[in-house]
């Protein structure tokens, strides 16, 4: 097994990320809470641990509606969190170590820098990609991403999941809950089914949060812009529980 070097570029950035709306202190608090919940959920199932952690970052990390937006859903990604692809945060429970070090430089208090150091040490042993690399890297054939000294990059195609878009759009959130509950009756309850229901309920909490942001954005806008925001708000209300009926609603849902 090759010793993993976690310092350096870990992800492919497909676009330049906007600076977080949260202050450095707010970001630090969110990442600490995520780390705490992840640590305290160690003895739980992976499903329960995941939903516990997701509740820390959602809907907290969703951004305000901007003037040009026609859909709600802008989202911040911090150096520590949960993701589905390497280009946005990371895969699974992640820590982007180089970004965490850059974030550390934004903090002026030594006490705050030490808080970052503690998280860094924890995620060295818990970041999904770091754990994966420890298992698959070799001394001379398999390197980590990005390492051109090796013929094979272990994490070049590492990704977390792909949505079943037809099932999502054909059933809607409440429809998906019904499908899961039907499976529970046939197969019996388990942690996966329970966490799946909780994740759909969390989605609905996010929609409620987004509607608040949209309604806040309606203050002091032109009549034309108000119509756009009203459609956004109405579509969010629909997809909170029903399957989308228009293309715009489908876009908003996913």
Stretches with model-predicted labels:
Residues 1-182:
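Long, non-catalytic protein-protein interaction scaffolds
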Residues 171-254:
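Structured, charged N-terminal subsegments at the starts of enzyme catalytic cores
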């Amino acid at each position: 097994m090759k010793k993993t070097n976690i310092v350096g570029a870990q992800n492919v950035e497909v676009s330049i990320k906007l600076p977080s709306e949260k202050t450095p202190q707010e970001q630090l608090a969110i990442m600490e809470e995520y780390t705490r919940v992840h640590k305290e959920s160690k003895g739980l199932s992976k499903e329960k641990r995941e939903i516990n952690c997701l509740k820390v970052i959602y809907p907290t990390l969703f951004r305000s509606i901007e003037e040009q937006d026609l859909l709600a859903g802008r989202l911040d990604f911090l150096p520590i969190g949960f993701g589905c692809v390497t280009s946005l945060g990371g895969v699974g429970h992640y820590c982007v170590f180089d970004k965490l070090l850059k974030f550390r430089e934004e903090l002026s208090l030594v006490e705050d820098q030490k808080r970052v150091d503690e998280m860094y040490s924890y995620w060295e042993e818990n970041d999904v990609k770091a754990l994966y690399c420890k298992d698959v890297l070799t001394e001379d054939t398999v390197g980590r991403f990005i390492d051109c000294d090796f013929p094979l990059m272990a994490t070049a195609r590492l990704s977390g999941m792909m949505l079943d878009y037809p099932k999502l759009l054909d059933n809607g959130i409440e429809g998906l809950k019904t499908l899961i509950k039907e499976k529970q009756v046939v197969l019996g309850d388990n942690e996966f089914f329970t966490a799946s229901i909780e994740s759909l309920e969390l989605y609905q909490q996010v929609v409620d949060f987004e509607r608040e942001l949209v309604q806040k954005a309606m203050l002091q806008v032109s009549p034309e812009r108000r119509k756009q925001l009203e459609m956004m708000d109405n579509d969010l209300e629909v997809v909170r529980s029903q399957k989308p009926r228009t293309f715009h609603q489908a876009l908003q849902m996913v």
